[in-house]
A protein has these predicted regions:
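Multi-pass membrane proteins that catalyze or facilitate reactions on polyprenyl-/lipid-phosphate substrates
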Residues: 1-260
Length: 260
């Protein structure tokens, strides 16, 4: 990977990891355009995921610190932490699906699946315009539902994680700010756990990897990830999550026509 490719991939990952437009699909399309072998470039993608997780931790540093204190000492934050862990535990479904249907693992690199996933999540995002919401904190049922939505996004390339989880939260009655906040909290263990799972599953050698571009990709993803978080929080707070629907549908259709 060159430094130019590292900057490009970091930019794509940083902007699209949190905006509900599927970072994996955008990376897949970008890597196809750059002529890179996506199955051989595990570590650059892992670096960008770590960069975006760092962006969440920095953006919500006060919230994470407060949750840590309340979880240890007791308080309302302990319940939130347990609900995040409950939602994250749903990811065992992904492992079970991969074991039961090994062919599903190849969906990650399939442009057709990414195109269909994008169009599907686009329709879902459009539907959130009519979701009724009000409560500020997720229930156990809502946490499980958002966790299962995260599973679907992990299995079906193109199905945005943030779009699926935030949208599900809205349909289960959360107000936009609470849905987005809980989705970001869920993203930290999910993304880190997913990266570790991919590394162990792929068993890619690290000794021949050029660390310079990898580190650069992670830093770029961190910077643009912060900007994307702020943009999404602003739009979701205004009830405009559905704005991303037409873009996902259009990009999915274009990818199907030109890349399939």
């Amino acid at each position: 990977m060159t430094y130019g490719e590292a900057v490009f991939l970091g930019l794509v990952q940083g902007l699209t990891e949190f905006l509900p437009i599927s970072s994996t699909a955008h990376l897949l399309f970008a890597e196809k355009w750059l002529g890179m072998g996506v199955k051989k470039d595990l570590y650059p993608e892992m670096a960008t995921h770590i960069g975006t997780v760092a962006a969440v931790l920095v953006y919500y540093r006060a919230l994470f610190a407060d949750l840590a204190r309340q979880t240890i000492r007791g308080g309302p934050g302990r319940r939130t932490t347990l609900l995040v862990l409950l939602a994250t535990a749903m990811l065992v479904v992904v492992v079970l699906v991969h074991q039961a249907v090994p062919a599903v693992k190849e969906w990650r690199f399939d442009v057709r699946v990414a195109a269909i996933g994008l169009m599907g999540v686009g329709v879902f995002l459009l539907a959130t315009k009519w979701a009724r919401h009000g409560t500020g904190e997720p229930s156990v049922v809502t946490s499980i539902a958002m966790g299962l939505a995260q599973c679907v996004a992990a299995i079906v390339t193109g199905c945005s994680r943030s779009g699926s989880t935030i949208g599900t939260g809205l349909f289960f009655g959360l107000d936009p700010a609470a849905a987005a906040r809980f989705s970001f909290l869920m993203s930290v263990p999910a993304v880190l756990g997913g990266s570790l799972y991919e590394m162990l599953r792929e068993k890619a050698p690290f000794d021949a990897v050029d660390t310079g571009p990898i580190v650069l990709a992670g830093v770029v993803a961190f910077v643009f990830g912060l900007a994307a978080i702020h943009a999404l929080i602003t739009l979701v707070g205004r009830g405009k999550l559905y704005w991303f629907g037409p873009y996902c549908i259009a990009l999915g259709a274009a990818a199907w026509l030109w890349l399939v």
